[in-house]
Structures are given as structure tokens and as C-alpha cells.
Amino acid sequence: MATTRRIFCSQAAAVLLIPRLLLSQTKSTSRPDVAAIDHDRILESATHYLTQSPSPITILPCSRSPGTLNDFYSEAENYWPDPSNPTGPFVLRGGTPNPDAFNAHRDALLNFAICVPALTAAFVLTNESRYAQQALVHLHAWFLDPATRMTPSLLYGQTIRPAKTGQPEGVIEAVHLSEVVQCIPFLTNFEGFAESDLAAIKKWFAEYFDWLNTSRLAGLARDMKNHHGSSWLLQAASIAHLNEISDDAPLTTLRHQYKSSTIRAQIVADGTFPRELTTPNPYRNTLFNLDMFAGICVLLSTRFESVWDYELQDGPGMRTVIARMFPYIQDRGAWPYRADATHFNELPIRPPSLLFAARAYNRPEYAELWKTLKPDPVSPELQRTFPIRQPLLWVTRPKP
């Protein structure tokens, strides 16, 4: 059949459209439908928490705490009594955790930080008020009720007995609050969320942000060149992001900190976190740190500036780090460093860093791998290193 001018033009137009069509397909596969993928998982978890009453730290007293009932208190579980000095400072002993170490506040805070995002995600999916109402019940107990609210500090976190103050490492025990902060803009769409309660919750986080920035203990955590420093930055960034509309200066400061010091302090030329590789659980802590870095990038990026793309002149950024870890998330057996001391075979859990990086870098292979991995850790030890459980709250824009 002879080629007419019309046929030729149609074929030429089709050829020209192919790259655009392929690009649109790539974009769609690098941005999976998180609401559809996690729908059943979210509702199952939220249904469980619909009937769970709050467990604030005030109902879990510890006679060894130097603070009040409202003060968070935990003890470093790798420290034991010194046999040569029974009344002296506890000494570090690796391996088996000390079963006498008090960590009920840590566990209660973790449960709270799993509960509220699950309920909020269910509210986002269904718009059913019962989920938002139950989330507010827990928020009220932890942040508003004077009798049960937690003091907005971690002054006594990871205390080494018989000391009367905590350690910088204690700040990481509140890293899960970062996802609780993500819930607040979504819950404001619930008509039962009183303006006064919203203001009081924001005030609690503002006071905690102030503690993070003025406390000597928190300052030491901020300056640590490993996952403890990342934990500080993720917490600070989440609160600054919450209050960005009223004051964007803190977020700008944190963005500068990430670009000027955090990357340089933690990432080396081959895209690894060298300080995580020296820990007893290098694989787990690398994934933990990567997830926190990814959350930080989500919070600090704007329509005009993506910190995902920032790289040092003499070193890499997040693009290199995620590319470096990708094959080891695909195949744990390819991990070239020593295996973790515990729970190595239970990893990887579905890392939010893969999903966020897929969206940031238009890498569908990251999203495809993310979809295949189990979403939730079972072991409490692993749960403590998994601060982002509801990615729906991180990739969805709240309704104004």
C-alpha cells in the first residue's frame, strides 16, 4: 500500500510521541498508589487501635526516675552493675541486655507512635470520623491533659544508673514522634479537632523543639555523626515543617545544616555510612539511617529546592547512597560487610527510603522492589529502628 501524506504524518507523530509515553509510564511506576497498596494493612492496624486506650507514661512509674511522673525516663540496657563496685556506676557490657533496665516509657512511646499514624492513615483513606476521634484521644493523653501529658524533653532518656540525667543517645527514643507530627495536618480536616487543642499540641511540639535546640544533652545528640545525629535532625525537621507556614526560618536553618554538615559528617565517597558499619548491627543501622535521611529529604525539600539532589563537591549525596544500598536491599546475601548480631535474617523490612527515592529520582525499580518487601517488623528491637510506618502520610498532601 502506497504511503500517503496523511499516513506518513500519522506515523511520524506516533514516533515522536513514544518517548513522551514512555516517560509518563516511567513516572507512574515510580509513584505507586500507596493508598491502594496499603489499604488493607492500614485498616487492619487501625481497627486494632480503635479499641486500645492510651498508655501515657504517667501510668508507668519508675521509683528510680529522678524526674516527675510526667517525665520520660529510660535506662541504658547494655549497662550492668559493676561486680567490683556494686554501688558505683554501671559498666558497659555488650551482648545480652540487662533485663532490669527500665524501658516501659520507651515502649509506651513507641506504641503511641504506631497507633496514631495508623488511625490517621485510616482517616485519610476512609474519611471516617471514628479513626480521627480515636487518634485525638491518644494525642490528648500524651500532649494535653496535665495529669498525663509527657514533659516535652528527654532529659532522663537512656540514663546509666545511678546517674540522675540521661545521655545524648536517649534522644533517639523519640524519633518515632516524627511520624506523629505528620498526622497533625491531616487531622485538622476532622471537624471534631478543636482549634484550642490544635494550638496546644503545636505548643507542645514547639517546646520540645526548643529543648532539642537549647539542651546540652540534645546538642550532643545533634552533633553525633551517626544515626543518633540523624534522629535529632528528623525530629527537628518534622516539627519545623509543621510550623513552616507561620515561621519558615527554622526549616531554612535545618536545610543549611543538612547540606553543610550532615552529609559531610556521615557519608563517604563510596556512598556508605562508615560509622554504621562499625556497629554490632551494620545492615540494620545502615537501613535505619537511610530511612531517616530519606524522611529528612522529604521534609526539607521544597517546590523550589530539592535536597535530594544536593551533593558535595568532593563527595556524594543521597542519590549515591540509595544506589549503593539498592542491590543489598534486593539481596541481603550480597551484603559485603559482616552480618548483624541479631535479627539479620528478618531484614530487610520494606524501607520507606526506597519509595521516597523512587519518587525523587524517577526510579521505578526502587518502587517495584519496595512493593515486594514485607511492610512491618515483628520484633520490638526492629520496630525501634523503623520510624516511618505509614508512607501514605509522607507522600500525600493534606487537604487545605
Residue ranges and their predicted role:
Residues 105-109, 226, 283:
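Short acidic-aromatic active-site loops that bind/stabilize oxyanions
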Residues 238-333:
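Long, repeat-rich segments with strong aromatic
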Residues 7-24:
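N-terminal export signals
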Residues 115-125, 233-239, 293-294:
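Alpha-helical scaffold elements that line and support the substrate/ligand-binding pocket
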Residues 170-173, 229-232, 286-289:
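An alpha-helical repeat/solenoid feature that recognizes helix-turn-helix modules
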Residues 188-260:
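Eukaryote-skewed repeat-based solenoidal scaffolds used as protein-protein interaction platforms
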Residues 13, 25-221, 274, 299-304, ...:
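Extracellular glycan-targeting catalytic surfaces
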